[in-house]
Amino acid sequence: MISKINGKLFADMIIQGAQNLSNNADLVDSLNVYPVPDGDTGTNMNLTITSGREEVENNLSQNIGELGKTFSKGLLMGARGNSGVILSQLFRGFCKNIEEEKEISVQQFAESFQAGVETAYKAVMKPVEGTILTVAKDAAKAAMDYVDQAEDCVDLMAHLIEAASESLDNTPNLLAVLKEVGVVDSGGKGLLCVYEGFLKGLKGEKIEAQAPKLDTESFVNDDHDFHGVINTEDIVYGYCTEMMVRFGKNKKAFDEQEFRNDMSEFGDSLLVINDDEIVKVHVHTEHPGDVFNYGQKYGELIKLKVENMREQHREVIRKEQDGLQNKEANESKTVETAIVTISVGDGIAELFKSMGATHIISGGQTMNPSTEDIVKVIEQSQCKRAIILPNNKNIMMASEQAASIVEAETVVIPTKSIPQGISALFQYDLESSLEDNKRHMSDALETVQSGSITFAVRDTKIDGIEIKKDEFMGLAEDKIVTSDVNQFHAVKGLLSKLLNEDSEILTMISGEDADNSITNQIINWIESEYPDVEVEQHEGGQPIYQYFFAVE
């Protein structure tokens, strides 16, 4: 029987909870409702709790109150994305409730979960039911209702997990979009993984780290690991080569071991996956053509890809140098008022700088900066005042959390997109007070409509729109309004929703994957269909999104 939890046992719970979430992060990511490339709930929650776990492992204590403070601090500073911030707030309240204790009883254990829920709900401006908040609330209520019957902390935790699981299964009944897509809430699932790990820790059991599953669809990560490679010329095999071969009836019989042996002669980093009808191959080689010719001995080539890794390495070096320069600029720049913008893409960063941004933090949809990232920039600027432009709804809560931590008087302008950030920054007045700037910059968001074009990462149906993986989607604000296999048609569908007879200016920001011919086609179409609209086009260089649009 475990009637008390001390610091050591709580540390074991945290470590197992973090490990269980880490093992299931991909599963949690897969529950994301929208088919938009995303920072992803599982990834953000995993990074958040890993920060808390590392802080705990470096500052172990028998005193649960002291350990709780350490855990809470790690979560707070490492919080990424809205799901990560909510997770940090749940355990901020939990740990606040035990901060004076050396060990806690079953009753205090239950009360701490309830305290966490109350703290998290207060931190969210407009709580939505059917999310991680609901799962946490229902689980905590069940624990409080059961505490008098619980044999010990293990029994209470098991009961809490049962209630959390039931609540998670009910989330589609509370949130229509979950029911439409046929999934449970991703944040709630992530929290359940943490709770299940807690129970393992309480029982003295260990969850082993699981190797990440190989994605046979994308096959390999396009981001090659160049660590340790100093000179581009040191790369022996310069072409990352992939192929899929469908076996032919009248072709050479496939012997996997022979195939592997022969393929290994072409280079290194060989991966071969055989699923009876198709063989998938990844190899680094100097002669991609020879690889393809060899593959044709066995059947038809149905998918080919070649990437020049030497060119990629040159690009990595360039970006690292640019990043170092930006880091040094951020660290060395001291200002009276810091204007901190979260931005992705070299062109967008330069645009923000030209408009008066003093500090740029690299981040966006698939790379949410942590609370600590934002805090560090503000503190290193030694400013008296700060304005944060999150430019993404999933970075909003981390920005607000950072604003509450720093000593400088800091406000957050609720910009949910890059176009909104640009419109807000246009209204910044060096001579105005912080409150006046906050009001004027926030008011500017009412005058701009934002849109974007990106690709779908999964098949789904949202708001009656059938979406297929790899189609181009048009988003007006956060709502998917069109999806088409043809990029230009997707853009037309989106702009037809954004533009009207009152529209005056269209700002178009092209991403790194934007096609110049399509960009020109878009401009010509706008000039023809909306002759009174002035078009301003910028090279943003952002990944994931081929285009950002702002209509005023």
Curated annotation (Swiss-Prot):
List the Pfam families.
Dak2, FakA-like_C, FakA-like_M
Identify the residues that the record assigns to the DhaL domain, covering every copy.
8-200
InterPro entries recorded for this chain?
DegV_domain_contain, DhaL_dom, DhaL_dom_sf, FakA-like_C, FakA-like_M, YloV-like
MF annotations from Gene Ontology: glycerone kinase activity
What the entry lists under SUPFAM superfamilies is as follows:
DhaL-like
Q: Which domain of life is it from?
A: Bacteria
The protein's matches in PROSITE patterns, at most eight in alphabetical order, are given as: DHAL (PS51480)
Q: Which SMART domains does the UniProt record give? A: Dak1_2 (SM01121), Dak2 (SM01120)
Which terms does the UniProt entry file under GO BP?
Answer: glycerol metabolic process
**NCBIfam families annotated for this entry?**
FakA_VfrB (NF038248), YloV (TIGR03599)
Q: What is this protein called?
A: Uncharacterized protein SE_0901
Report the source organism: Staphylococcus epidermidis (strain ATCC 12228 / FDA PCI 1200)
Q: Provide the taxonomic classification.
A: Bacteria, Bacillati, Bacillota, Bacilli, Bacillales
